[in-house]
Amino acid sequence: MSNDPGNEVSSLYPPPPPYVKFFTQSNLEKLPKYKEKKAASAKQTAPNNSNGGSEEEITCALDYLIPPPMPKNQQYRAFGSIWQVKDQLPDLESMGLTQLYKKSTENESTNYQYKIQELRKLLKSLLLNYLELIGVLSINPDMYERKVENIRTILVNIHHLLNEYRPHQSRESLIMLLEEQLEYKRGEIREIEQVCKQVHDKLTSIQDTLRTGSQSPPSSSQ
């Protein structure tokens, strides 16, 4: 197996980082005082813009225990890949692709019915281009590239539009799951109430039987 550091970064389960050795119980006990000292030092060094590197070099091990700030460039690297801080789906034009469906307005961005209509239009266009591709292949097979590219563009637009629809799909799936759980809990409550009623009726029947037996006159002996 290769010992290339790049392979370790992009592997599924990379080894722990080297600074994990600083996460000791002793350092955790020193961390609160170090944070206070570092904050006070930052206030003192901020006006004159002095360099406090010497102190940080002495206690640099405790810096690894402090969570890093949010990245300023809206990107971060994890497992060898670059991720966006804000999970936002880029539009097709920014990726250099042709967008066939119309852009959603502010009112349409939350109205997912228009996305369903656009999906139906794209599906019809896909079927039409597929039939045209079959016709081109039967007449002049060398002219298939343009139709294949059109089909590819339509499929990319369908896939992108489906990704825009996923937030609504997730909410609806969550609503359905909660409704199923609610109905299941209601069914359990109904069954518990039914069993409680049966137990209550049984106890009432036993009490009536005992009461009737105690009130009956004793039989006279001959």
UniProtKB/Swiss-Prot annotation:
InterPro entries: Med7/Med21-like, Mediatior_Med7, Mediatior_Med7_sf. Residues 34-55 are annotated as: Disordered. Residues 42-53 have a biased composition (Polar residues). The keyword Transcription regulation applies. It comes from the Eukaryota. One of its GO terms (cellular component) is core mediator complex. Belongs to the Mediator complex subunit 7 family. Component of the Mediator complex, which is composed of at least 21 subunits that form three structurally distinct submodules. The Mediator head module contains MED6, MED8, MED11, SRB4/MED17, SRB5/MED18, ROX3/MED19, SRB2/MED20 and SRB6/MED22, the middle module contains MED1, MED4, NUT1/MED5, MED7, CSE2/MED9, NUT2/MED10, SRB7/MED21 and SOH1/MED31, and the tail module contains MED2, PGD1/MED3, RGR1/MED14, GAL11/MED15 and SIN4/MED16. The head and the middle modules interact directly with RNA polymerase II, whereas the elongated tail module interacts with gene-specific regulatory proteins. This is Mediator of RNA polymerase II transcription subunit 7. The gene is MED7.
